[in-house]
Regions:
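Outer/extracellular conduits and scaffolds centered on Gram-negative outer-membrane beta-barrels
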Residues: 1-262
Length: 262
């Protein structure tokens, strides 16, 4: 036909997903940072996917040139409906780096959140003034000017796992594809565009480069001569809070548009 439109709505439930969870200490396991042998696979999770898929096309002839335009739109929402134990959190993503203590997970599976949810400490720039330093040292007595400011989200005067918050997921809000095909006599032309919007990515390479003081950003980090910078000051301790994995500092917008084929 000259034109067409197709719309699909769906909902799919998956039960008893096979997931890797940490072996409890009561089982005699000794967890080792950066290793995986303290984890085992078991069926513990239920997942729900729901969304919409739209496909459309339009054919038209411009004299001797035949064309076809087609597009598709996909929006999928998923969330972990439940895990086997109430309030359980399954750590699902560790940055791919060598440093042992920096392998604190940044992605989790938790009831009510999407798959690949980033649950990390929120940061609020760097400590820039003596007044900010004095206030922040109530949370971290070892803090210095130029350090990242972690947010005490629950307001209890302490920084711990309870302060970690949901900061997006690697699941996109939607995906779009657009194709153009044209034919003139013995000549064919086609181009495909693809776009993703709303997904969050964790820049592990940036985190590693910061921790080893090899990232070009660090030239512009906070100093007394550059007092407005939100790039944290490099520290000699590679486990310093400025380069810890589990903060939103290394999260980035993963949206993009690209030409897939031409």
């Amino acid at each position: 036909g000259k034109a067409g439109l197709e719309i699909d709505l769906y909902e799919q439930d998956k039960e008893d997903m096979l997931l890797a969870i940490t072996t409890p200490i009561s089982a005699g396991s000794t967890p080792v940072n950066g290793e995986t042998y303290d984890r085992f696979l078991t069926n513990i999770g239920d997942l729900r996917n729901r969304g919409i898929e739209i496909n459309a096309y339009y054919n038209h002839e411009f004299g001797p040139v035949s064309t076809k335009f087609s597009a598709n739109f996909t929006k999928n929402e998923n969330k972990v409906v439940k895990l086997s134990r109430e309030g359980e959190v399954v750590f699902d993503g560790y940055p791919n780096i060598i440093r042992i203590n920096q392998t604190e997970p940044v992605a989790v599976l938790e009831a009510g959140l999407p798959v690949g949810a980033f649950k990390v400490y929120e940061t609020n720039g760097t400590i820039k003034t003596d007044e900010e330093l004095a206030a922040y040292q109530l949370l971290d007595p070892n803090a210095q000017k130029g350090d990242l400011k972690y947010v005490d989200t629950d307001g209890n005067g302490e920084l711990n796992n309870d302060d970690k918050v949901f900061k997006g997921s690697y699941q996109p809000d939607f995906e779009i594809g657009f194709n153009i095909d044209a034919n003139y006599k013995n000549f064919d032309f086609s181009v495909q565009f693809y776009a993703v919007s709303g997904n969050t990515i964790y820049n592990g390479q940036k985190q590693y480069a910061y921790s080893t003081k090899r990232h070009s950003d660090l030239v512009f980090s906070w100093t007394d001569d550059n007092p407005t910078s939100n790039i944290p000051t490099p520290r000699s301790n590679i486990e310093h809070p400025n380069v810890q994995t589990s903060t939103d500092y290394f999260l980035e917008d993963g949206s993009f548009i690209r030409v897939r084929n031409i």
